[in-house]
């Protein structure tokens, strides 16, 4: 099951050329970029691991691409994404996020249903990948 989080998530994987164009856009708008990775793909896992330091005041997209390549090389079977942060007063938020690397096999999620009093149903998601210990999931 393909993980769909962030911008472009329903499109085919971006090529390096397409990623470079998005990074050039991020730099041209004066946004700060950072690279993050995880092996826990749960949709509510918003705390991915930060790769290096955030790239503030970067004037060249190749610096961000270098960090992406380094992360891909060190974590080839992890999800890797780029975030663009706008520090403009009143916004001060992540304005763009997209996945740039995925594991070769994405096992998907288990939907668990529980019955509660009053015929109430509660649902939860469980990633099949998290059945293995952290660092050995893919």
From Swiss-Prot:
CDD domains noted in UniProt: RuBisCO_small (cd03527)
Matches recorded under SUPFAM superfamilies: RuBisCO, small subunit
Superkingdom as given in the UniProt entry: Eukaryota
Broad class of the protein's primary localization: plastid
Sorted UniProt keywords: Calvin cycle, Carbon dioxide fixation, Chloroplast, Photorespiration, Photosynthesis, Plastid
Subcellular localization, as worded in the UniProt entry: Plastid, Chloroplast
Membrane-crossing segments per the record: none
Origin species: Pyropia yezoensis (Susabi-nori)
Described purpose of this protein according to its UniProt entry: RuBisCO catalyzes two reactions: the carboxylation of D-ribulose 1,5-bisphosphate, the primary event in carbon dioxide fixation, as well as the oxidative fragmentation of the pentose substrate in the photorespiration process. Both reactions occur simultaneously and in competition at the same active site. Although the small subunit is not catalytic it is essential for maximal activity.
Protein name per the record: Ribulose bisphosphate carboxylase small subunit
Note: In this alga, in contrast to plants, the small subunit is encoded in the chloroplast. The basic functional RuBisCO is composed of a large chain homodimer in a 'head-to-tail' conformation. In form I RuBisCO this homodimer is arranged in a barrel-like tetramer with the small subunits forming a tetrameric 'cap' on each end of the 'barrel'.
Gene Ontology BP annotations: reductive pentose-phosphate cycle
């Amino acid at each position: 099951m393909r993980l769909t989080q962030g911008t472009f998530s329903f499109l085919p994987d971006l090529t390096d050329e397409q990623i470079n164009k998005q990074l050039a856009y991020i730099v041209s708008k004066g946004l700060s970029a950072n690279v993050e990775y995880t092996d826990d793909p749960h949709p509510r896992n918003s705390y991915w691991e930060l790769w290096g330091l955030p790239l503030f005041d970067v004037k060249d997209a190749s610096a961000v691409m270098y960090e992406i390549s380094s992360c891909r090389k060190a974590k080839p079977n992890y999800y890797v994404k780029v975030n663009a942060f706008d520090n403009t007063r009143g916004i001060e938020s992540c304005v763009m996020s997209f996945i740039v690397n995925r594991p070769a096999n994405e096992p998907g999620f288990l939907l668990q249903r529980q019955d509660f009093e009053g015929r109430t149903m509660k649902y939860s998601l469980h990633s099949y990948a998290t059945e293995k210990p952290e660092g050995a999931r893919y």
